[in-house]
Amino acid sequence: MINLFISMPMRGKTHKEIINTRYRAIARVKLKFPHEDITVINPLPFTSGERPLPVFCLADSLKRMTTADVIFFAKDWEIARGCRVEQFVACHYMPQILRMYESKQNHRKKEPFKCLTL
């Protein structure tokens, strides 16, 4: 079984766009691991109207990310602060975890993203 964490920008996205991004991520990971079951590590659920501080959401994401076997960085992850922090942590503190990327830039260059530095 593969535990999948999806790092994706969510600001300004509709519920449908978020769900479609998740499906694309799952499909890409399934292509790489066709004989494995995939469990998506879901973010902390919030009740309608609840607006926690962004740093609270980021801390929760980092905690949940530690249980992942694969971290998938969705399109435009490079422009979202939280995604950049997740990528930094994944590279520098969790190097054993497989990182996969969905980005136009990555597909054109045909090379993996380098780990971000401070």
Residue positions per predicted region:
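Conserved catalytic or regulatory cores that recognize and/or transform ribose-phosphate-containing ligands
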Residues: M1-L118
